[in-house]
Amino acid sequence: MPTLWKQIVFSFASILSIGSVVLLVVALSTERWVTGTTLCQTGVDLVNASRPELEQFTGHIYYGLFQGGKTRRCGLGIRRAKIYIFPKLIKKINSGLHMIIIFFLFTAIGFAVVSLAFCIYNARKVPYQSIKGPFGLYIWNFIAGKSIAMGFACFLAAIQCHKLTEHVANYSESLFTLVILEENLGFSFWLVVASAVTHGANILVVASSKIHLPKIQTKKPEEPTATGEDFLY
């Protein structure tokens, strides 16, 4: 059986691994990777709108890796539309890069689960192979963290280099052209970043299992010694 300190350390590492999986699943299933403001350029050009009137032609957009939504204002009131990345929109964007992002994140989930399994194993037993001990946990957490970092780096590249938001906003728009006024990374993206940080913290936690705490020694109570006077008494 591992020592009490190691049981505590690996139990906490298990919690971090669970947290990483939860963060990634929530990030993948939500639609706030990017939020932004759009301008209906076609409507502005048609009426030659001045700056005070531009508010009547501004809308909003939000999307994730699988779906999202937008509101469009082109002088005809607010129009809401749902955005689905699959199966059609994926053909209009850099589909290879998009699939790589999803692949990296699912890979990270897989290695986070492996890390969880080995944390539980180390909390209950003393491993007889180094790959099953802290060394293996370093590897699984490093691969998971690296995969996450590659995933959000590719997503940033899709936004900055391939104008992902502009393609998503103008998909299925035949009469109007939408211009991106502002785009921000939403909370779903930052959940992915937090998941990567979790794996870094997990490596530090696992490393702390090597710390040897001093054993608390309890003094045995001294036994009373019988003297000759005690016997006479």
Curated annotation (Swiss-Prot):
Localization in the cell: Cell projection, Stereocilium membrane
Signal peptide coordinates: none
Entries under InterPro entries matching the protein: Clarin
Residue spans crossing the bilayer: 8-28, 100-120, 139-159, 187-207
Tissue expression per record: High expression in utricle, saccule and lagena of the inner ear. Expression is restricted to hair cells.
Main subcellular localisation: membrane
UniProt keywords, alphabetically: Cell membrane, Cell projection, Hearing, Membrane, Transmembrane, Transmembrane helix
Cellular component terms per the entry's GO annotation: cell hair; stereocilium membrane
Bilayer topology: Multi-pass membrane protein
GO biological process: auditory receptor cell stereocilium organization; sensory perception of sound
Role description: Plays a key role to hearing function. Required for normal organization and maintenance of the stereocilia bundle.
Similarity comment: family membership: Belongs to the clarin family.
UniProt-recorded name of the protein: Clarin-2
Gene that specifies this protein: clrn2
